[in-house]
Regions:
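A positional/structural detector of protein chain ends, strongest at the extreme C-terminus
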Residues: 262-264
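Cation-handling catalytic/transport regions enriched in His/Asp/Glu
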Residues: 1-258
Length: 264
């Protein structure tokens, strides 16, 4: 069998960064007791998803995205296309993810153990309640949506969406500093969050690192959903040049109206 070069596409590269984030979370934990190593389910995806942000940054692509034969760096034009494509179809993708997370909750909050029509339940959950359209086959159907019954994510698929809020806000700390490789912030992320495992509530750890509650704006910007707030009314005022005013001679308004009628 002829040997061939094994390459990674962009999605596989993001997955590599994602799983490396999980690995770092495990390697950096410095808790005294093994029982304090685990974190809440809706916090576990933060370390992995935040790593994905670096995968497509031009500064990072210059370091690893090299042509496998010539070793040439990726052209800047291609880097920009990759960046712009990140917002493609994000509205529908987010709708699908939210529908999947909510339908996961639907099936795990049933108050009856009696058998029921799964297909009818699915149609209600995805189409009637969540607004998906039947012309597009749903990505997450119950028969093969393994997260809802296998792998520890039952009633927890929302972890991924909540982690997007956290990871985009956490990455904003690096981005807004002007250096996505800011060592000071990276050390704080490791010391205040990654290394502490589950010794405190996840949001306590997050606030300790970020100094604030997570903000949804970075996620909305990343997806292309953000709309700049309307300026205050005073800022819309335009200063017009002075106009010479001529006073109209006093007259009886009824007389003026009558004259206007006569001209018609």
């Amino acid at each position: 069998m002829r040997a061939t070069t094994t390459l990674l596409n962009l999605d596989e590269t993001k997955t590599l960064f994602h799983e490396f984030g999980h690995a770092l979370h495990g390697l950096f934990r410095m808790v005294k007791y093994r029982g304090l190593a685990d974190v809440e389910g809706d916090f576990v995806e933060l370390p992995s998803q935040v790593m994905e942000n670096w995968a497509t940054e031009p500064e990072m692509l210059e370091q690893y995205a090299l042509h496998y034969r010539t070793n040439d760096k990726m052209p800047a034009s291609l880097m920009q296309k990759i960046r712009r494509s990140a917002q493609f179809n994000q509205g529908f993708e987010m709708t699908e993810l939210l529908a999947a997370a909510l339908s996961d909750m639907d099936i795990h909050t049933q108050e009856t153990y009696e058998p029921f029509d799964v297909n009818a339940f699915e149609r209600e959950a995805l189409y009637t309640k969540r607004g998906l359209i039947p012309q597009i086959e749903p990505r997450y159907r119950y028969p093969y949506f393994s997260h809802i019954f296998d792998g520890g994510y039952s009633a927890g698929y929302y972890f991924y969406i909540w982690a997007q809020v956290l990871d985009k806000d956490a990455y904003e700390a690096f981005r807004s500093s002007g250096d996505i490789f800011n060592k000071k912030i990276a050390r704080a992320f490791r010391k205040k969050l990654l290394s502490r495992g589950g010794e405190a509530d996840g949001m306590t750890l997050y606030r300790d690192f970020r100094g604030q509650d997570p903000d949804k704006e970075p996620l909305l910007r990343a997806c292309g959903f953000w709309v700049e707030p309307e300026p205050e009314p005073d800022s819309l005022a335009v200063k017009l040049p002075a106009v010479k005013r001529t006073l109209m001679p006093s007259a009886n308004l009824l007389e003026l109206r009558d004259k206007q009628e006569n001209l018609k």
